[in-house]
Amino acid sequence: MAKKITAKVKLQLPAGSANPSPPVGPALGQHGVNIMEFCKAFNAKTMEQKGTIIPALITIYADRSFTFITKTPPASVLLVKAAKIDKGSGEPNKNKVGKVTAAQIEEIAKLKMVDMTAKDLEAACRTISGTARSMGIEIV
């Protein structure tokens, strides 16, 4: 018989450096999960992507065990890296803070395809382009 799911928790954590302090501790502690066990497993799984923000979907079962799935980094994080900027614009329609090429947009879309609902690469590119525009990043 399958285990009974008691909770699903979504967290965005820096790859390879999760620790029991907030947000991990409070989010998992209230469900009785062994926090250090999660941190060690997450860090081992994401060590090669160190420094990137990685979303994790944690499924917690009635016996206090857990499983987790890591997703691809958010499009905004990938765009900030590609444009080599610190953060997006506070006024995206007035102030442009960086530039990315169409090739970079396509590369990000290929990486994000597994987590997106887009039917093809062209639709994924349009989605990523929209994210870039809303961050004040110009597409050249």
Swiss-Prot record:
Gene3D superfamilies attached to this UniProt entry: Ribosomal protein L11, C-terminal domain, Ribosomal protein L11/L12, N-terminal domain
InterPro entries: Ribosomal_uL11, Ribosomal_uL11_bac-typ, Ribosomal_uL11_C, Ribosomal_uL11_C_sf, Ribosomal_uL11_N, Ribosomal_uL11_N_sf
Keywords from the named record: Methylation, Ribonucleoprotein, Ribosomal protein, RNA-binding, rRNA-binding
PTM comment text: One or more lysine residues are methylated.
GO biological process, one term: translation
Pfam families: Ribosomal_L11 (PF00298), Ribosomal_L11_N (PF03946)
Keyword presence, rRNA-binding: yes
GO cellular component, one term: cytosolic large ribosomal subunit
GO molecular function: large ribosomal subunit rRNA binding; structural constituent of ribosome
Family membership noted in the UniProt record: Belongs to the universal ribosomal protein uL11 family.
Chain's role: Forms part of the ribosomal stalk which helps the ribosome interact with GTP-bound translation factors.
Quaternary structure, from the entry: Part of the ribosomal stalk of the 50S ribosomal subunit. Interacts with L10 and the large rRNA to form the base of the stalk. L10 forms an elongated spine to which L12 dimers bind in a sequential fashion forming a multimeric L10(L12)X complex.
Protein name from the UniProt record: Large ribosomal subunit protein uL11
Recorded name of the encoding gene: rplK
